[in-house]
């Protein structure tokens, strides 16, 4: 299981811990990932994804998973999210 958001592609970043005496030690900044089940209105079922807290807010802001995936770039999405995006597009075309 990778430490990467399935919707935005956010992953670990590197930087320094800096002490009061300005001593620097390397560290990793990990994304705030959560396992969530988002409801797809088009598919009529839940989709389990591992996404960041920022991505969850973005999904709510855009009006749900279907609207978020419609505007999302394919290169940012994981294989699972890309599969769901194609399922949604196919279901919307059939309806």
Curated annotation (Swiss-Prot):
Signal peptide: none annotated. GO terms for molecular function: structural constituent of ribosome. It comes from the Bacteria. Residues 1-22 are annotated as: Disordered. SUPFAM superfamilies: L28p-like. GO terms for cellular component: cytosolic large ribosomal subunit. Keywords: Ribonucleoprotein, Ribosomal protein. Pfam families: Ribosomal_L28. One of its GO terms (biological process) is translation. Gene3D superfamilies: Ribosomal protein L28/L24. NCBIfam families: L28 (TIGR00009). Belongs to the bacterial ribosomal protein bL28 family. This is Large ribosomal subunit protein bL28.
């Amino acid at each position: 299981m990778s430490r990467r958001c399935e919707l935005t592609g956010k992953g670990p970043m590197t930087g320094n811990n800096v002490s009061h005496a300005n001593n620097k030690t390397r560290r990793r900044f990990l994304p705030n990932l959560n396992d969530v089940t988002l409801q797809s209105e088009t598919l009529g079922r839940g989709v389990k994804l591992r996404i960041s807290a920022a991505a969850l807010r973005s999904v709510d802001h855009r009006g749900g998973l279907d609207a978020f995936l419609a505007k999302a770039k394919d290169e940012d999405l994981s294989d699972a999210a890309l599969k769901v995006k194609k399922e949604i597009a196919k279901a919307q075309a059939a309806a």
